[in-house]
């Protein structure tokens, strides 16, 4: 009986320690997202034929990815890609654009600190006349 109580006590202690370790990890990832998005640049896209370039920008340790979201209320969409200007004049992901709306989404992932890039943005359709968006990198 004493052995069972000792084992139960040890299991409760381990569970408590594991639970305590999970909260700070969640808080750290939340804090990292806040600091990344907290430094976001506000930009504006006005409709034109073909893509428009923004930048150049240089990545920092604030974000591991290049992220984008639309902040205009009309639920529009924009196509976007990243061009790493010191290495190429083509978009990432085999020169393909990705579609972006109001939720934060990555345009490029796992980008090294100090990398120079431009953001290329184009309209999803002609409704994208005057679109505000944010860029976090």
Label for each model-derived stretch:
Residues 28-137:
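Post-signal peptide N-terminal regions of Sec-secreted extracellular proteins
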């Amino acid at each position: 009986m004493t052995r069972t109580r000792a084992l139960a006590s040890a299991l409760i202690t381990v569970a408590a320690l594991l639970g305590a370790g999970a909260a700070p990890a969640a808080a750290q990832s939340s804090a990292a997202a806040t600091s990344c998005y907290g430094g976001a640049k506000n930009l504006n896209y006005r409709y034109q034929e073909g893509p428009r370039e923004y930048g150049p920008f240089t990545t920092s340790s604030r974000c591991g990815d290049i992220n984008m979201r639309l902040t205009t209320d009309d639920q529009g969409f924009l196509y976007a890609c990243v061009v790493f200007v010191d290495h190429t004049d083509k978009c990432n992901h085999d020169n393909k654009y990705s579609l972006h709306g109001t939720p934060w989404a990555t345009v490029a992932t796992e980008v090294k600190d100090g990398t120079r890039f431009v953001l290329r943005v184009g309209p999803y359709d002609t409704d994208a006349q005057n679109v505000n968006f944010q860029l976090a990198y």
